[in-house]
């Protein structure tokens, strides 16, 4: 007869895909199981992401490889500290110019 199997054990589940905040994912990009995309990362069109992507890093290709960091390390650290995406809607509205311009000094003072 047929053998009954537990389908949850039929494949090697590498875990959830975790997408950070302020991330842009290009058209037809594929992100494999168990991968974490850091805050502010950019995934290129049709990239196949097989490994974690650090915050504010641009990746592309098959498999996806880092192309460059979006900002200098001190700017990335400041943005990760500020976490403007956790602000209230009102606070974002008051600081939208600084967010859109990427003015870190204004963001750090954002009230």
Task: Name these PLM-found stretches.
Residues 24, 84-87:
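Signature tryptophan residues that serve as conserved aromatic anchors
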Residues 91-111:
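ABC ATPase nucleotide-binding domains
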Residues 54-55, 63, 83:
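Proline-centered helix-kink/hinge sites
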Residues 62-71, 75-76:
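Short, charge-rich, low-complexity interaction segments located
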């Amino acid at each position: 007869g047929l053998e009954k199997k537990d389908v949850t054990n039929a494949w090697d589940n590498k875990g959830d895909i975790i997408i950070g905040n302020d991330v842009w994912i290009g058209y037809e990009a594929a992100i494999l199981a168990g991968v974490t995309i850091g805050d502010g990362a950019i995934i290129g069109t049709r990239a196949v992401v097989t490994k974690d992507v650090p915050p504010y890093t641009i990746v592309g290709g098959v498999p996806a490889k880092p192309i460059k960091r979006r900002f200098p390390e001190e700017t990335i650290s400041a943005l990760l500290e500020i976490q403007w995406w956790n602000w209230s809607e009102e606070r974002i509205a008051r600081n939208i110019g600084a967010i859109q311009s990427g003015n870190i000094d204004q963001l750090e003072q954002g009230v």
